[in-house]
A protein has these predicted regions:
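Phosphate-binding glycine-rich loops of NTP-binding sites
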Residues: 103-115, 159, 164
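A short, proline-enriched helix->beta-strand linker immediately N-terminal to the Walker B motif
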Residues: 116-122
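Walker B catalytic acidic pair
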Residues: 127-129
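Conserved D-loop-proximal element of ABC-family nucleotide-binding domains
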Residues: 134-135, 139
């Protein structure tokens, strides 16, 4: 599978031997969120690129899907892990909370929203959208993805095997901006 831009530039070549080997092309903003990306080490770097920008507000807005009491998010050094990890503050609480203590779903939302916000004018690939996300919050995340992809001119490609995910996509797609494509393997042919 290859995605090309303007019929010439290969943005994402996928290779049979390593389906996770992706080469990013210079000049085209691109992010790939894999199925297992919940607490990716890249999140701190992605956060830094949009910190103090107009888009930063969308991070907490997206996290509100799962916990509306979140006020702020920042990445702080963790001496044990030797990396920066996400912490949040909650309304009415002074203590900071590690985002990792709040479940896989909220960490998946963070990874998705940070990747999306770093693709302005580019492309986001999101493998298995629903992984770690309860079906009840999927429609709200889809609405944020639709809104931001239109606002920031981002083309989003998502895979899923989940009927709940497909149903929430259809419900959130009220402006008909998204397109659902079903691929099947029939007798060795993709149709």
């Amino acid at each position: 599978l290859e995605i090309t831009f303007a019929g010439e530039t290969t943005i994402v070549p996928f290779y049979k031997r390593n389906r996770y080997a992706i080469t990013k092309m210079k000049g085209i903003p691109f992010e790939y969120v894999r199925t297992y990306d919940f607490q990716t080490t890249q999140n701190a770097s992605l956060f830094d690129k949009i910190s103090l920008s107009a888009e930063e507000k969308y991070i907490v807005e997206a996290l509100h899907i799962i916990d509306p009491d979140i006020e702020k998010l920042n990445f702080l050094n963790d001496d044990l892990q030797k990396r920066r990890i996400p912490y949040v503050t909650l309304k009415g609480k002074e203590k900071r909370h590690r985002l990792s203590s709040m479940g896989d779903g909220i960490n998946r939302v963070l990874t998705i929203i940070l990747a999306l916000l770093n693709c302005k004018g580019g492309i986001l690939l999101l493998d298995e959208f629903e992984t770690g996300l309860h079906h009840s919050i999927q429609i709200r995340l889809w609405k944020i993805i639709f809104m931001l992809s239109e606002k920031l001119n981002i083309q989003v490609f998502v895979t899923s095997h989940s009927q709940d995910c497909i149903n929430s996509f259809v419900e959130a797609n009220n402006k008909q901006k998204g397109k659902l494509i079903r691929l099947e393997n029939r007798n060795g042919n993709v149709v």
